[in-house]
Amino acid sequence: MLAKRIIPCLDVTGGRVVKGVNFVELRDAGDPVEIAARYNEQGADELTFLDITATSDGRDLILHIIEAVASQVFIPLTVGGGVRTVEDVRRLLNAGADKTSFNSAALANPQVIEDASAKYGAQCIVVAIDAKRRSEEDARTRGAGWDVYSHGGRKNTGLDAVAWATEMARRGAGEILLTSMDRDGTKSGFDLALTRAVSDAVDVPVIASGGVGNLDHLADGIQLGGADAVLAASIFHYGEYTVQQAKQHMARRGIPVRM
């Protein structure tokens, strides 16, 4: 069984790491290079950087931050936020990223996933999906499930999250980064039903995201949600737990991890 990964997530805006609740109420968490170096020392398997307002603000890529981080950190870096084209993938890989994450751009132009995957390999291409459980009213007409949101969670696309994940994997995504908007920042645990539904539907790794409040939540994402990796932010940023403590806990739960 492959080792399961713990991935701290750094949401970046205005050159700073921030953390919010349900995609709003942002709170400063520090300097991205300093925080990345700390996680590198703690034994994180990877890091994910998301420029959370790049698409909605129409901003360019955070290349200068990635270059600074890549000069000090020697674990895989995934970068998302404002990634729109195959050329953006090239620029980020040249800056030191190992993977690039598409979100809104894949919704606007699904072909970009095929093109980027064909040019750079599926292992470099992550599709991030921000999903929210349908309201009771919507569920009555469309059935229970989750819709995909774009533009930093501001716009409901009306697409079914499981169907979209399946299409993205088919088009060449090497991983799915799956965030529950309902759970984001709430510390109430992953949406395990969502995680399991997507994990069962696709044949590429799924990274569970949104809602981690304790170490059991991380283990549950793997064992109950079927995720291949778990992503968390606030429990690590504010010093509640270290990555090493998280790995030790997961190992005690019988999950293979790299110590």
UniProtKB/Swiss-Prot annotation:
Active site residues of this protein: 11, 130
Q: Which organism is it from?
A: Polaromonas sp. (strain JS666 / ATCC BAA-500)
Gene that encodes it: hisF
Give GO cellular component annotations, separated by semicolons: cytoplasm
Give the record's family classification: Belongs to the HisA/HisF family.
Coiled-coil regions, chain positions: none
Write down the EC number. 4.3.2.10
Give the enzyme's main class according to its UniProt record, as a single word: lyase
Q: What is this protein called?
A: Imidazole glycerol phosphate synthase subunit HisF
Task: Name the pathway.
Answer: Amino-acid biosynthesis; L-histidine biosynthesis; L-histidine from 5-phospho-alpha-D-ribose 1-diphosphate: step 5/9
Keyword line: Amino-acid biosynthesis, Cytoplasm, Histidine biosynthesis, Lyase
Query: Could you tell me what this protein does?
Result: IGPS catalyzes the conversion of PRFAR and glutamine to IGP, AICAR and glutamate. The HisF subunit catalyzes the cyclization activity that produces IGP and AICAR from PRFAR using the ammonia provided by the HisH subunit.
Q: What is its main location?
A: cytoplasm
Subunit structure of this chain's protein: Heterodimer of HisH and HisF.
Q: Where in the cell is it found?
A: Cytoplasm
